[in-house]
Amino acid sequence: MASWRDIILSEFQPQIAHITLVADPDGLLLEEGIFEEMRARGFDLIPFDDNVAFRYIYESKFRSRWDNGEETDSMAVLRLTSNELDLLPYDLLQAGRKVSISLADIFPNLSYPIVATLDFIYLDTLFQAQEKFSPGRLGDNATKSFILRYVFEIIPEFIKEPKDLLLVLLRRHYLGMRIPPIVDEYLIQFLQQNEMFKDWPLDIIVSDRQAFFAFLQERWPIFLNTLALKGNEVCEEPSRYGLRFSGPALLPFDHEEIRVYIDDLFREGLLHPVPCREAQLPKEHWIKFGITIDPEESYYRRIVGLMDSVEEYLKDNMRHEMWLHFAYKWAELLALEFTSDFGLPDTYKERMDALKSKIDGMFQDWILKRYASLINLSPASPVMLHHIPRFLARNLAGDKRTKIAFLLIDGLALDQWITLRNVLKELDSRLQFRESAVFAWIPTLTSVSRQAAFAGKLPMFFPTNIRTTDRESNLWAQFWAEQGLSANDIAYIRGLGNEISSKHYEVLKQDRLRVVGLIVDKIDRIMHGMQLGTAGMHNQIWQWTKQGFMRDLLSILIDSDFRVYITSDHGNIEAKGIGCPNEGVTAELRGERVRIYSDPSLRTKCKMSFPDSLEWPSIGLPEDYYALIAPSRAAFIRKGDVIVSHGGISIEEVIAPFIEVERA
């Protein structure tokens, strides 16, 4: 069989039944490729996580039409997250065809509990390995070994000395491999049997990306000093250097297989250059990225390197995980472009403009094709903003001592997070950030995306509040009440950005408080008054962060024993005016990047005047909410004017940071 998806899709042939009831404990129907093909065959997926929400969708979109005798091409697929189909309501059991799908059926010779921990992105590789090597029945450990070898190309038996281990970890963390914790534990236990690695902090650096790069960062100056001294007076004792992480002080950065990663790590901001007298070092290109030399030369070298890296990464048919990973590369490049004192030469500007155009086109094509498949993915690793509350609830459950602070910085783009993060590190070097990213709701408006982040629901489930944030605190409280918290356990604070008042401080210090939602709206206020484009945004964010509000807020939260998570409801983009629609009060929201209508015919009429604009399909939105999105890097304002705004579907607007903050 060509693909594991074919096994699943064989159960779903068009026009078999109006409704199919599917036991899908592994979430296979949510995989991007399957979801896309199911939609192409006319199947609409309805999750049964929430009976009330399910009934709303099923009764309004399907059953009422079937009962009226309407002929429709749509077929409903009710997805249950367990195998207990018989627990469904009687009317559904009578009307529906029953199907069960599982990873155990696709990988019969591998240990199901181990395979079930793998991200979907790796199932193609695992299936190909199974077809090629036809393993006999494998137990847990043998399955872990099989996955390491054939999915992640890690053969534990070949890791014998430091260069071998460094190469494996560099490849793993640079590529952002998502190895399941249970497989990581197996690998760590194997490595711990080697005396060569007895002092290495394997429990931390094997699985923790940020910790691994911090481990490398504090050893990079030692390596440079060794080169300068030509090997003389080098001490292997870590205590001499005051290292935070255990392990050898000197690492083989110059090994030919390792150094190919080093310049990439520096140019992408994963490692940071350190002061060193270049004259004392070998004249090797790969080292120069890691030392502070002439600022202008360093800037141009790094920006060219980042442009190369961005171009190399872009591929057809990228999955959502790849776009989230790519977004950080792109954000580093944008932050570098807009925060430097050095102007870009015309050739660099032309290359950047070409990149922006290419990314806009590829991302829009992907969004139109795959965005709908993201909505019902598991919140275990949040992919969209409305997944975050359920992710937080999982972390809160089971331990009454856990406290969570959910800090949303309204309007903060991912590239602006890079600037904010860098200043925070300067102000407090103990702060550590575990960085990931999530997709915002489209249209990327505060009333849509921010409310989804606090409600933990699709916007279609708060239709009366979709045009205002006045009841956002109620949505936040309602979500946590459904998780079993009382009103005294929950807090919500908005309008932050300048100072932390005594009233806010008292709220955060309440003994019973378990979860608090905080909104910093300073960035959004800067954006809506910005006349100097994206570069001006970065400058204002740099100045504001320097004032210390964010540092102080994070300190209060961490000192109060909160687990702190930062995100944004959407980003922003510099856009050029293409003219204002002449339609009076027809549009309910007359935004710069998006116009909202209650009637699709009114939207279509406006599109006729702006043929390159996009009639956004109302994915997850209320029935009377129709968005017309301005073309790439364009705005519905006076022709030729330039603003910074949001509402559209550029990667800068749609992919938002999701950060866990700790302090060493």
Specify the residue positions occupied by each region the protein language model found.
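…; additionally, a secondary subgroup of soluble metalloenzymes is captured
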Residues: 1-404, 411-564, 568-664
